[in-house]
Design a protein with these regions (language model features):
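Cationic, histidine-enriched alpha-helical/coil surfaces that engage anionic ligands
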Residues: 1-502
Length: 502
């Protein structure tokens, strides 16, 4: 069974019995409104018993009626923007859709929770050439809970959905006229959310920061990056660009915060979670590192004059990249379906629900967080000084890689503290990020040289010239030397005394 995806950009409005839709011709190039008739829709929404999908702004439904009958999974992207992943109509939840929310459900059953019967009156908003700009629909909705309780609700709402590739100015112009006519932006992001609210069966609200203690700020940071990790999970399963990188970054930030803020959270509880985050980051790194290295080497080859690309260089790199990518992606997807990974997600939830706070957590953030940031900074300074004192070679490469890791932890610690400490923490994070970038480029060169050597050996063994591979190796060697020279300058900027005044 296959699934396809559609990016949905729409706005919802609340209306009433005495409100009439305004004339829309002339707004943002709308030349005509075409009546497309009324369609009867029957949608059953699925969720866990504790409404985990609804709490995350996700909806999963089985709908009949209309032109797109089938299963629809809607994943939030941004305000007014969702990705709708579709699967053919069938009785049970399609496995491709269930897989996309596995990080949310973690084995909990997806069962019917709400049924919505809608009469949809559709109008197409067209330009002078008859091109569809947007679709406006007036939905008269009847909602019924399916958990055995008598909850029911009825309402009417208006939706305006932008046509594929359309201009957001159309939505803005239509909204201006709708609001002038008395319509108001809907309080609920989806029909399911409205149905749950009107029947008293609301999803659990997201916890918000309620104070300015060290514990408040650290937990707020952790909560944001657990959310980022879960959002990236679905993106990785869909093989979206940069998704593995985003998931890996969320994993690193969480692990770094747990280690940097041990004065706030009891390490007896957080160290095991940090170890599991380290495991996950390592597994994700196989896929991400392959992706980064392929892009780097491809760019190097593309920049060479054709006269210096001797032999089947591009073909050999393509075969190497395809084989590595296939294996890496399969391994990543397998990891996301393991009990170990799902147990890690449970552990993160437990950490946020019942945090192991230490006495320092109750103190003002401005007193506790600077110490943690400066401790990470001191570790970074020691590692940079050690690396710069070593002669060029493998030992220095390893020391620079260790300094890179310390730079990440310092940057993440400063970013976590920035909401409480303001500009000084943000400034330190920016300067350390520059150091991290130089060290990251250096490490990428170290990895690239090892791969280029292997590719050269294989090319030679196959009777091909290794000239181009050697040339690329030399370029990477020169690049690493340049990054080492550059490090002194960026480190001087990041080690200015005023930056340590948090």
């Amino acid at each position: 069974m296959t699934a396809d995806t559609k990016r949905e950009i729409e706005r919802k409005y609340e209306t009433g019995p005495d409100i009439r839709l305004p004339r829309l011709k002339g707004a943002a190039g709308i030349a005509e409104t075409a009546d497309r008739g009324v369609t009867e829709l029957d949608a059953v929404y699925y969720d866990t018993a504790d409404l985990r999908l609804a709490a995350a702004g996700i909806t999963l439904r089985r709908r009949t009626g209309g032109e797109d009958a089938g299963w629809h999974l809607k994943l939030p992207v941004a305000p007014d923007v969702r990705d709708e992943v579709r699967a053919p109509l069938g009785d049970g939840v399609p496995e491709p859709l269930a897989a996309l929310v596995r990080a949310r459900t973690r084995g909990a059953e997806l069962a019917p929770v709400v049924r919505l019967l809608s009469a949809r009156d559709v109008r197409h908003l067209l330009d002078a050439q008859g091109t569809l700009l947007a679709e406006l629909s007036t939905d008269t909705v009847r909602a019924q809970l399916l958990d055995g309780t008598p909850g029911r609700a009825e309402w009417t709402e208006v939706e305006v959905e932008l046509a594929d590739g359309g201009d957001l100015a159309v939505l803005d112009a239509v909204e201006k006229r709708l609001r002038k006519a008395g319509l108001r932006p809907a309080a609920s992001a989806s029909k399911l959310a409205r149905a749950l609210a009107d029947t008293g069966r609301q999803a659990p609200p997201k916890r918000k920061k309620t104070g300015d203690t060290a514990g408040d700020h650290v937990l707020s940071y952790l909560r944001a990056h657990v959310d980022a990790l879960l959002a990236a999970d679905a993106a990785v399963r869909r093989d979206l660009p940069d998704s593995v990188h985003k998931m890996r970054v969320a994993t690193r930030r969480l692990r770094s915060a747990l280690r940097s803020y041990r004065k706030v959270l009891d390490r007896a509880a957080t160290d095991p979670v940090a170890e599991e985050l380290k495991w996950l980051g390592g597994e994700l790194g196989v896929d991400r590192d392959q992706e980064v290295l392929t892009e780097r080497l491809t760019a190097r080859i593309d920049a060479l004059p054709g006269t210096l690309v001797l032999g089947p260089v591009r073909g050999r790199l393509r075969v190497w990249a395809t084989a590595g990518r296939a294996g890496a992606r399969g391994r990543t997807l397998a990891v996301l379906d393991t009990d170990r990974y799902l147990a890690l997600l449970d552990a993160l939830d437990a950490l946020l629900t019942d945090p192991p706070l230490r006495p320092a957590a109750g103190k003002p953030a401005a007193k506790v967080l600077p110490r943690a940031v400066l401790k990470e900074y001191e570790r970074l300074a020691a590692r940079v000084d050690r690396a710069l004192a070593l002669p060029p070679g493998e030992e220095r490469d390893l020391a620079l890689h260790a300094a890179r890791k310390a730079a990440k932890r310092t940057r993440y610690a400063a970013e976590a503290a920035a909401p409480a400490l303001g500009k000084p923490a943000k400034r330190l994070a920016r300067r350390v990020k520059s150091v991290q970038k130089v060290l990251g480029d250096h490490q990428d060169s170290v990895v690239a040289r090892a791969t280029l050597r292997d590719l050269a050996i294989k090319a030679y063994a196959a009777g091909e010239t290794a000239f181009t591979w050697g040339l690329l190796y030399g370029q990477e060697q020169a690049s690493a030397a340049e990054r080492e020279r550059e490090l002194g300058e960026v480190w001087a900027a990041a080690s200015a005394g005023k930056l340590r005044r948090l």
